[in-house]
Amino acid sequence: LVKTREGRPIKIEPNNDASFNGATNARVQASVLSLYDGARMHSPMMDGAAASWAEALVKAQSLLTANSVVLTRTVISPALKTAISKLGLRHVSVDAVSQSNRADVYEALTGVRALPTIELAKARLVFAVGADFLGDWGGENLNGAYAAARKPGSDMLRHIQAESGLSISGANADVRIKAKVSEYESVLAHVYNKVANAAGVATVSAPALREDIKLSVEGVANELIAAGSGSLVLNGLNSASAEKLAAKTNELLASAAFNMSKLDFTATGSDSDFAALLEDIKSGAVTSVLTLDTNVLHFSTAMASLADKVSLVSIADRLDETASKAVVALPMSHYLEAWSDAAPVSGIYTVGQPTISPLFNSKSAVEIVNTLAGGSESAVDLIKASAASGSSSKSWNALLHDGFADIASEEVASGSIDMSGVAVSAPLKGLEFYTYTKAGMGAGNNANNPWTYELPDPVTRLSWDNYVVMSAADAVAFGVEVKAQSNGSMNGTTINITVDGTTLENVPVWIQPGQTQGSIGLALGYGRTEAGKVGNNVGVNANELLAPAVNYAEATVVASEVEHGFASVQLAHTMMGRKIVNEINLPTFLSGNAKEWNEKPTFESYKGPLTSFEANLWDDQDHETSHMWNMSIDLNSCTGCGACVVACSLENNVPVVGKDEVRRHRDMHWLRIDRYYSSDMTNEVAEEEGVGAIEKYAKMEVPSESPSV
């Protein structure tokens, strides 16, 4: 739902009436600002010069021949799929963050290329392995369902996370297990084997687990068996074997939350189809490519190296790294300017209508593709035709009013996961390198939007950069330091990373509590060169080291001489023993004796201990007749995702100050979500070990290697 004022979109909210877990995240809220981005294409372009639509379309049609290919990211619009099919060309979809191998598993099982949906409300125990389901993993936004399931009570959701780098999901977990990315398959295999033994079915061969996580993983398996159909196992690795292990475990447990009859179509790109396209370009079998809303030359170095072998026609919102290399570039309207439709999951159909007239000389993607195919229909007529072809009984006006319609789900074949092809990879012994996405930036589609840069990462509390996350132990081994400066800013060491002979130089390093030793990660979406004045040359392109189809690789690291300045909004990372936030376990909470764990603080005075109200030096606000404003945040419900921070900036036109001013702690966000780690040093430990006050407080400032958050 989009709120408009005087013909302008100003706020986006989820449509809670729709039978879909959708919600708004930070990037959705920030997308309103992208509407006004001056770096968007103002008109069609031919050979780098402005052209009319008539000229550009004729030229584009002349380039699209029988040996052309349409290249897109995952398309969930039925109308756009129909328009693409009218072109009569081979269609390849590839995603910057690939889930291709996972989708392969379910395509082989059901005959439909899609992923299962997750019904978190039906789970009582979730075990996620590398799946940041409160961040960017999956097509559904599960934050709302998670918040509802985490209300304290006898049936409160228990959450266990196994992962390499500390994610939003890991920070919210009850139990967190540190595992390298290359160990994810082993972790899933050992859990599966335990469940399989209990069910009396065949197990799989798997490498031994590290001794420091072996008992934890066995304990997880026992909990899953005890929870039965209330269990849920999630896999975040783009691996067919890993996905089969997770899916089969859910099958054996009869998981009610793992729904393979309602499918998720938001990540159906095919790495194998894309690899075949690259081979055809090399051989000359493909001479031109129509790219649609995909910046493939940024995230695929393989495609970038072949760009001069094909004629590109690009439909994009700006002259990005791909469109700038195109013979013809056709400007695509922002989604808030365009008619559109979508079928993100089976059983639901949605429509979008313009909230503002196009600011530039652009057209909707469906209208452009339809015109290239020889059609003359307007965008609204194409969407009307698409809606009419569905199985909904709603009228067009009712569909527009509601924004969605429930439709008949596509019939899918049912069956059991075939485990015969499962091969569990041995973990890397050396240093592993992996990529991940941030809540604000994602894969970089909004890389010229300053709100996505200025939003502090929920875990690291850094803005404006990407950086390698590294454990404290690895930092010592590689000579890496991060130090506070006299003005309160943070500076740190940079490193040169080499993977398969390719080196990224002077990459900043952030020492991250909770990071698994022997594993380093780098966020995607940065290192842009043709995003616009905000996004150009910010950070480094992680895809230069790792293609989207690759989960991890062995790396070598050498510290460099260049120092990097971080834009950190939080310098104190522990509470240093202060009881700012009360935390207790669930059984204690359910005991009902709140006085034992929620004692009201008192302050010493000459009159003796006083409550905060009694010690107040000023008269209390008159809450009966005066203005009053307050807000209480349920810390069990808040995941720290940062969506509200950007939403507040959107609603209140909060200015962006830039990296240099953030380093001076002059950021102007109206909302602040601080993140605190536990420390190994506590008042009780200090008393037991006879540690003095100065040493105690110094050690309290140091987060644990595996902290609670």
Model-inferred region functions:
Residues D136-M156, S300-S314, I348-V351:
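A short, gly/pro- and small-residue-rich
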Residues R318-G352, M668, I673:
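Flexible glycine/proline-rich, aromatic-decorated loop/lid segments
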Residues V69-L71, V126-G130, I160, L232-L234, ...:
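Structural motif
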Residues A162-S167, I315-E321:
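Short, polar loop motifs at secondary-structure junctions
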Residues V201, S357-E411, D660:
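N-terminal leader/propeptide and maturation segments of large enzyme subunits in energy/redox metabolism
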Residues L1-E211, L462-N466, A473-A477, V482-V709:
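N-terminal export/assembly segments and adjacent metallocofactor-ligating motifs
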Residues S389-L462:
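Long, low-complexity segments enriched in small/aliphatic residues
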Residues V175-I281, S389-W396:
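Active-site phosphate/pyrophosphate-binding segments
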